Amino acid sequence: MEEFQRYLELDRFRQHDFLYPLLFREYIYALAHDHGFNSYMLLENIGYDNKSSLLIVKRLITRMYQHNYLMISANDSNQNPFFGYNKNLHSQIISEGFAVIVEIPFSLRLISSFEGAEIVISYKLRSIHSIFPFLEDKLPHLNYTTDVRIPYPIHLEILIQTLRSRVKDASYLHLLRFFLHQYSNWNILIITTKSISIFSKSNPRFFLFLYNSHICQYESIFLFLGNQSSHLRLISSGVLFERLYLHKKIEHFAEVFANDFPVIPCFLKDPFMHYVRYQGKSILASKDTPLLMNKWKYYLVNLWQCHFYVWSHPGRIHINQLSKHSLDFWGYFSSVRLNPSVVRSQMLENSFLINNAPKKLDIIVPIIPLIGSLAKARFCNALGHPISKLTRADLSDFEILNRFLRICRNLSHYYSGSSKKKSMYRIKYILRLSCVKTLARKHKSTARAFLKKVGSEFVQEFFTEEEEFLSLIFPRTSFTLRRLYRGRVWYLDIIFINGLANHE
């Protein structure tokens, strides 16, 4: 790491913050594909055994400017020798080189080593674990919620304009604009959701960076207007797309947006407004009247259309009352219901009844969508009947069992905060029987004959793992253990939405 920092410091000193020359530095591409930097750069090594060459990079950049070479239709994009997905590894080398270089001005981990600056953690963005206290402590006291899907795609020039505030190299921005427009022409980046999925798989780091830049710009304006419209700050929680922390965020937005938003409408004032986001989905929750929520809805639509030039219909943003509708967020179905109770009180010779109806939070496991996710992963059919899963022939019985146990444990931990855990028994039953059928298929036997041979204790770990974990903290016979097993427990190893819980 010190070696690459020394290289970057040398280039920074010589080129005066110019990023374009870094495209011709071979250590940039080594930085992108080295095993030692995967955890930092969020890039999974995909098997680049050959070293990138300076001549290859120059040749590819030259071809980008040859318009005759780039005149390829969208239908032939899979056969494109330059941008083809998994057709030519050199095309991904240069595209991921773009991502590494454009992250340098935003990476305080490297910049702080040059300037001796300390990393400043922004208080505006919190960890994923702040979602759990929001569900437990804040949501029962709120009345209305709004499901907001952050619209995309956006115009490429808006992305370039966002990057221009931090990237000062005009040559690099020009080449980046040309690069993005070629993706746009081939219907790969900004046309359909399927196209974005292809682009995010072929260029994960580049996609994450562009998406994060767009989200940060949107939330900067949104939180600025929210704070300006109320004496109390807008309470916000959220995380970057597949990242836990945002190291720095511009705090002073007044000078930037004063010309665009000279007057803040007074009707947006609401000290009880909460904003929570994960990836591209966010919610607005308020204790106030639905009239204010409607005004916030049209305010968001106008912000997207007028500032980001993204079409969004107001009818796609639904305002729901928590007492009547469930909130689908992060793979949980959350609702607030009244828990009526009657208390008899006596004062001197007079006795009277007091009706009390406190609000209670219910977090329910979405059993039907979860079974649908298991069916897509080939653990069961569409009706929820377990089936055998295809596995590699060289896997041992212990490895197959361990994989099923790991999936079951992750789901059990993820939904440990649910109010009714009995529905998880059906999921565990599907995984257990699917594991038995998979092992029986490997041994060319039936599930009944295999269980009779190995004994039923072979798969009992599917139901006893959580109790054994809690027994390490409390005695197994104590009342506290039984109460915790029935109650809600949020595990700190939940750092992202579970793949099977993501039903969208």
Curated annotation (Swiss-Prot):
- Pfam entry (one): MatK_N
GO CC aspect terms: chloroplast
Places the protein is found? Plastid, Chloroplast
Q: Sorted alphabetically, which keywords does the UniProt record give?
A: Chloroplast, mRNA processing, Plastid, RNA-binding, tRNA processing
Query: GO molecular function: any one?
Result: RNA binding
Q: Would the keyword tRNA processing be found if you checked this record's keyword annotation? A: yes
- Main localization is plastid
Q: Please give the biological process terms from Gene Ontology that the record holds.
A: mRNA processing; RNA splicing; tRNA processing
Q: What family is reported?
A: Belongs to the intron maturase 2 family. MatK subfamily.
Q: What does this protein do?
A: Usually encoded in the trnK tRNA gene intron. Probably assists in splicing its own and other chloroplast group II introns.
This chain's protein is named Maturase K
> Which organism does this sequence originate in?
Fagus japonica
